[in-house]
Amino acid sequence: MVHVYKGLFLECDPPTKQFVEYISKQEHFEVIVLDETHLFLQGGDEKVINSIQRRIDDLQNQNTYSVFDKDQ
């Protein structure tokens, strides 16, 4: 029997995978874990993609050190 699902295939590193799983609980979309670096976002649409990208960008900006960000 064949099952077809509409969604988004996502390849990422394990820490990002965990973060996407965390986001999925807040944003209410279903994540199917395929392996340690691949996820399938069931029902993923443009809104979900933009939300994930925005949250990952915010996380990366928080974890990036810049000389120009030092308090003076």
Swiss-Prot record:
Biological process annotations from GO: nucleotide-excision repair, preincision complex assembly; transcription by RNA polymerase II; transcription initiation at RNA polymerase II promoter
Subcellular location: Nucleus
Keyword Transmembrane: no
UniProt keyword terms in alphabetical order: DNA damage, DNA repair, Nucleus, Transcription, Transcription regulation
Cellular component terms (Gene Ontology): transcription factor TFIIH core complex; transcription factor TFIIH holo complex
InterPro entries membership: TFB5-like_sf, TFIIH_TTDA/Tfb5
Family of this protein: Belongs to the TFB5 family.
PANTHER family: GENERAL TRANSCRIPTION FACTOR IIH SUBUNIT 5 (PTHR28580:SF1)
Subunit structure and binding partners: Component of the 7-subunit TFIIH core complex composed of XPB/repB, XPD/repD, gtf2h1, gtf2h2, gtf2h3, gtf2h4 and gtf2h5, which is active in NER. The core complex associates with the 3-subunit CDK-activating kinase (CAK) module composed of cycH/cyclin H, cdk7 and mnat1 to form the 10-subunit holoenzyme (holo-TFIIH) active in transcription.
Main function: Component of the general transcription and DNA repair factor IIH (TFIIH) core complex, which is involved in general and transcription-coupled nucleotide excision repair (NER) of damaged DNA and, when complexed to CAK, in RNA transcription by RNA polymerase II. In NER, TFIIH acts by opening DNA around the lesion to allow the excision of the damaged oligonucleotide and its replacement by a new DNA fragment. In transcription, TFIIH has an essential role in transcription initiation.
The protein's name: General transcription factor IIH subunit 5
Gene this protein is translated from: gtf2h5
